Structure formats: C-alpha cells, structure tokens
C-alpha cells in the first residue's frame, strides 16, 4: 500500500544515502513452525519479558561503517528518523539493535554478494542471550568449533556474521546471508545440519542455554532493493 511505496520510494533510499551508511535491505520474514528444526533437538526458548517488542514480519538491515553512523552526535540517521516520524508511526511493535561484527566467515557463494557490496538476496538474523558467564564461553567455543566451519561449506550461503550488541536487548546476534530461500524454506538451519564436518562437539546443544528474542531467528527474502 501507500506505506510500502513511501518506504521503498522515499525513506529507505534516503537512509541508504545517509552519511556512514553502506547499504540497506528490507526483508519479508517467513513464519516458522513452533517445533525443533530436527527431530529430537531441544525446543527454542524465547524471552517472555513484556518490555521486548514481539513484531517479526519485517526486518530492515542497515550496514554502517561504524557505530558512529547510528549513535554519534548529530548523525544523519537520527536526523532522518526525526524528520519522518509520521511515516514511521506505521512501524508498530518493532525493536532495534545496533551490532558490531565479532567474526565474518565466507561461504561457498561469497562471489554473489562480495563483502560490503550490498544486502544479500536472502538472510536469517538471530538475536539472543546466553544468561551466564559460563554459557557465554560455551557459546563462543561452539561457534568456533562447529558453526563457523559449517558456514564455509553450507549450500547457498554467501557468508555468516557473528555479532555483539551495542544497543538492544540481545547481547548476541548472527546474520546468515544466502542466495535464496526456497518456496518451502523457513530457515537456513537444515543446510547447516547437512554441512556437518565431524566436529564432535562435546558440549550441550546451543538451544539448551540460549534465550531468543521474540520470533528469533527471522529468515526472509529481500523485497527492497528488489532482487
């Protein structure tokens, strides 16, 4: 409707042109069933904190050259949001996070969207907490022992980014970038299971000790800029 025409025709192009912004992508998120990705896996845990907004249907990713792009004094992004409060009032029940990259791992399809060259055609973003010091260390070790090696060989994956937050509820974030999500896909997780490399991780399953933001992870296809 009129909001999408304004968002795609005016606001997001202006955001992409703001000082310090590298690229912007708007994604239509796919609903996922409330069951484990594979039989026998732990059930994903979500926060029940009423202060955390529960919207999930759309994600706008904005890549900046530094956190100053979003948090520095007198930045263009703040000014743009302040100038468009009427249009942005349509963004109900939404939440924001500012992340920095902890680790970037290229996948087999890296050539499709080289680093820094724009938003991927499809993506999955997760935001979550590991609530104890010990669990945060477990999480860091698991990513390095199992998930990062799999990203490098997972079908259709451009790259994976592990992130840490500057603002927002979640301490941890991940952004998995892909060439596509098929008509029956709602997650990249089955591809990571396919890509097992005999890692023999001896620790607990990651879902046993992380708490996701509402609806996280969110997987979707890019709707702006059009694929």
Model-derived features: where do they sit?
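Macromolecular interaction modules
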Residues: 1-227
């Amino acid at each position: 409707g009129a909001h999408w025409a304004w968002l795609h025709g005016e606001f997001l192009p202006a955001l992409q042109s703001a000082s310090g912004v590298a690229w912007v992508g708007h994604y239509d998120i796919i609903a996922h069933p409330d069951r484990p990705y594979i039989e026998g896996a732990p059930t994903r845990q979500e926060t029940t904190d009423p202060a955390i907004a529960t919207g999930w249907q759309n994600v706008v990713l904005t890549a900046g050259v530094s956190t100053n792009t979003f948090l520095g004094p007198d930045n263009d992004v703040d000014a743009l949001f302040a100038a468009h409060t009427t249009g942005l009032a349509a963004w109900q029940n939404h939440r924001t996070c500012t992340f920095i990259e902890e680790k970037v791992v290229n996948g087999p399809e890296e050539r499709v969207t080289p680093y820094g060259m724009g938003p991927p055609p499809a993506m999955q973003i997760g935001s979550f907490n590991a609530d104890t010091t010990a669990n945060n260390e477990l999480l860091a070790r698991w990513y390095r022992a199992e998930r990062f090696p799999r990203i490098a060989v997972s079908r259709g994956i451009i790259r994976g980014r592990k992130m840490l937050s500057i603002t927002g509820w979640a301490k941890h974030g991940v952004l998995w970038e892909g060439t596509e999500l098929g008509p029956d896909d709602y997650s990249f997780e089955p591809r990571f299971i396919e890509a097992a490399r005999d890692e023999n991780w001896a620790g607990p399953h990651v879902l046993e000790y992380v708490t996701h933001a509402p609806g996280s992870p969110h997987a979707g296809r890019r709707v702006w800029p059009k694929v």
